[in-house]
Amino acid sequence: MRKFCFLLCLLAGTSEAATYTVKVGQGQVKVEWYADGVVRVVKTPTTAEFVRKSLAVTAAPKEIKVKVKETQDTLFLSDSRIQIAVAKHSGEIVYRMAKRAEIVREASEAVFTSVDDAGRKSWKVKQGFRLEKDEAIYGLGILQNGKMSQRGVNRQLRPGNTEDGVLFFQSEKGYGIYWDNYSPTNISDKGTEVAFSSEVGDAVDYYFIYGGNADGVVSGVRELTGDVPMLPLWSYGFMQSRERYKSQQELLDVLHRYRKDGVPIDCMIQDWQYWGNNYLWNAMEFMSESFPNPKAMIDEVHAQNAKCMISIWSSFGPMTKPYRQLDEKGLLFDIKTWPQSGISHQWPPRQDYPSGVRVYNCYSSEARDIYWENLKRIYDLGMDGWWMDSTEPDHFNWQPADFDRQTGMGSYRSVLCAFPLMTVGGVYDHQRAESDSSRVFILTRSCTFGQQRYGANVWSGDVVSTWDMLRKQVPAGLNFSLTGNPNFNSDLGGFFAGSYNRSWKGKPAYENPAYHELYARWTQQGVFTPMMRSHGADVPRELYYYGKAGEPVYDALLGAIKLRYRLLPYIYSTSWSVSKRRDTFMRALVMDFPTDAKAKSLNDEYMFGRAILATPILNAQYTPEVVRHDADANAGWDKNTGRTQMNAMENVDFSHPSEHTAYLPAGSRWYYFHNGKVYDGGQDVKLEIPFSEIPFFIRGGSILPIGPDVQYSSEKAWDNLEIRVYPGSDAEFTLYEDRGDGYDYEQGKYSEIPMTWNNRTRTLTIHNRRGSFRGMTAEKTFRVTLPDGKHKTVDYNGKKIAIKL
């Protein structure tokens, strides 16, 4: 029997946090409580004090009532939700529910292998967990593997372009595990043992979260790492982008055309190279002669009732001000990054003219200050949002020595996976300190656990434009959401679409029916993501390239955008629930239907909020799916090899309806949104629908507000809404409103209108309004409708009313 001792100690600087330490051999195991059912476990190979401030976890330990019981072999620690059993001889831990049913157990002792980390002694650390053979787990970030359950995954997890590994999973059994390490980390699944193994670490350091169900686990994640701030209302409207607008006039022409054509839009996005050549990379100034007056450009965007977002990077060219400032202080990394060539207009890159671009050390607070000081030049022009590209960051032809660079927080190797968190957090914190008049909005390519607290929407990177990749975006977004971060989106139409150019009659992709179908379906799916943004390379994405009003493809694209705007009261109210109640936008079906085996395994359907069942069309129905077969199909920028000719594709007629089959989860009634037809759950239903119709259902027992037809999100007040009631069970919904921007809501300046539906009495009660804000419309008209078309119109002045239907 190894030497064992038990200590109850209080951590200095905390509020009497309960910490239990078990000495095991030469090392020790420490269990620290953050809430009932939420603990931190730290295992070290020595008894030296392990002191490290988590970058992801912001919560402090709490005093929790813990019952202690000791036997010869085991220490039992119990709170109101779970029991933790620590084996004295090995330090292995078993987690049980309060009623002693086993939740999960560690598979073995922690493994420590001595390694040299840039001249400092450290360890490669590993801990396994014994799972049931058929136990499904979810999370691990944005992975393009098409899977819902991530069992069987064996790979490295780290930030990337099209994939972002997040060191967290949650189980269908209602618990989650966050591995708090920032070095490159592998996850392995040997059938019954799932293990994390990190390249360097002074301890095994992880958090166990018992939530009882998926929502409870997500709530625990946000309790530990921070809640989601409200994003501005405009960020839920439609956004148009491309790689890239080559002048300020081109950007304005697109916006003017949209306003002329009646295409709703809230944001224009400017991609890279507005700064000029690559030696001026990310200068945080408009140096290109094609952008002679950026202030006038932004002012005109605002005059057109739209917002402007701009691309910024984690690296700087050698001729820029921020480069010189950072270089003087030793705050630039010497790693190979994008762009590789200083010549921006030639492809492939001219390696004989290296760009000299270098990544900045975002781990340094001084470097983050310099970053913002330079970015403020653009902020002061009136820029509304930041597109933070390459936040992983890009790192080509890496060598082991690249990771030896010291960051101020340790070696680059030891903190690599925290790069997105640090650089995104730096911009968020600085803008919050600057002003509360507008909300921070960030679009970023990479993510670290806990990043949801920084007002950032993560997109899935430069994905290739294929049907297979479209299908993969659904489980990628759902698993990412199950890590606690609700803000996911992808490039509508995919990013690399060059394989559709010239593959049909030598015509550009925007005349290719195969791309028409893919782009339309991707856009339709994008209605049901937190951010709806059209973007990509090789092919222009603006609607007017795809026909005109009355033609099927154009009508499908425009119809998707218009539907998005009609749903804004529902979406914005859901965003409040995400912020206040720790809710989730894109809800994997396991969250709402955990006992429906078929539903929880589906990777092509999901709930969008609590009412909408999204059943997007993710397969080609009118054109061939396969465009390229060769190895270059996913290689990125368009190459001249391997194109599949599509000249035989004739007489594609999108005016004909198609068939679509959707599964409706058991335990609910379901209403088809477009005609109100009701179906029982637990079955597949086959629909025949026109190309422009997006198939989705409303759950029985839901209240769905429908907004006005608008050209931008704030064009009309929500003073005349349709309130659709879908019977089947009792229902509740809270209509949320505020000014749409700014942080007044943090001081309680917002309104909530609770609504409840009594299914037995068929009565909708609109309760007293709670709260108010500047500019609030005090009186409203609600048209209350049922799926069969029956309706009543009522006036509401903030006082409770009941409507019997």
Regions found by a protein language model. Give the residues of each.
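Extended Gly/Ser/Thr-rich low-complexity repeat segments
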Residues: 32-36, 50-60, 85-99, 773-790
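Bacterial Sec-dependent N-terminal signal peptides
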Residues: 1-20
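N-terminal-proximal low-complexity accessory segments that begin disordered
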Residues: 18, 24-39
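Solvent-exposed beta-strand/loop surfaces of large extracellular or lumenal domains
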Residues: 51-67, 639-647, 672-691, 790-805
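Short, well-ordered beta-strand segments enriched in hydrophobic/aromatic residues
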Residues: 31, 41, 77-84, 613-616, ...
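A low-complexity, Ser/Thr/Gly/Pro-enriched, surface-exposed linker/loop concept
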Residues: 32-77, 112-116
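Catalytic-domain carbohydrate-binding cleft regions of carbohydrate-active enzymes
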Residues: 101-686, 690-692, 699
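Accessory, solvent-exposed terminal regions and/or long lumenal/extracellular loops of proteins
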Residues: 693-800
